[in-house]
A protein has these predicted regions:
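Short, small/polar-rich loop/turn modules that mediate ligand/substrate recognition or access, typified
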Residues: 84, 89, 150-152
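Substrate-binding pocket helix/loop in short-chain dehydrogenase/reductase
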Residues: 2-3, 7-12, 120
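C-terminal helical subdomain
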Residues: 92, 114-146, 150, 159
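Residue(s) in the substrate-gating loop at a strand-loop-helix junction
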Residues: 51
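Short, flexible catalytic-loop segment of classical short-chain dehydrogenase/reductase
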Residues: 95-106
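Alpha-helical segment proximal to the catalytic Tyr-Lys
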Residues: 31, 81-82, 148
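Active-site helix of classical SDR
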Residues: 26, 68, 76
């Protein structure tokens, strides 16, 4: 919904799920990453899941989701800046609409799920939804040494939604 439909409970749920969860996980992992870097010189990689519906692009009726995913982008860049000289890289992936069980739940909540799915697909320039298998190689790249010089970046995998 819009800001007018977003209750404080909706706001808290979305921010807890999308931003706070990443904060908690990163805060727990960073001390061990720092220890390992100090002992071995090896670098660690944090990969966050943002969305193109964040600071990259706004979509109607996605107010709190977009705001919470924009927080993920900010968190990613802040962590990258804080730890770039301490052996930790931090990047985010910003997918477009991915065909997941979560999306299926949202679609099935519409009065006409067939029409809802058609609407989700229609906003994709490629004419289809992404699959998790299309996002996974970006995760592998960011976790690997192939991306050793990348930090603080947001990688869009959106089927052309942002062009």
């Amino acid at each position: 919904g819009t800001i007018l439909e977003c209750t404080p409970k909706d706001w808290d749920f979305s921010f807890n799920l999308n931003a706070r969860a990443m904060y908690v996980a990163i805060r727990a992992a960073v001390p061990k990453m720092l220890e390992k870097h100090a002992a071995t010189g090896s670098w660690a990689s944090i990969i966050n899941m943002a969305s193109i519906v964040a600071s990259i692009k706004g979509l109607p009726n996605r107010f709190v989701y977009g705001a919470s995913k924009a927080a993920v982008v900010g968190l990613t860049k802040a962590v990258a800046a804080d730890f770039v000289q301490k052996g930790i890289r931090c990047n985010a992936i910003a997918p477009g609409t991915v065909d997941t069980p979560s999306l299926a739940d949202r679609i099935n909540a519409f009065p006409d799920p067939v029409e809802a799915r058609r609407m989700f697909v229609a906003r994709q320039p490629m004419g289809r939804l992404a699959t998790a298998e299309e996002i996974a190689p970006v995760v592998v790249f960011l976790a690997s040494d192939e991306s050793a010089f990348a930090t603080g970046n947001v990688y869009s995998v959106d089927g052309g939604m942002t062009i």
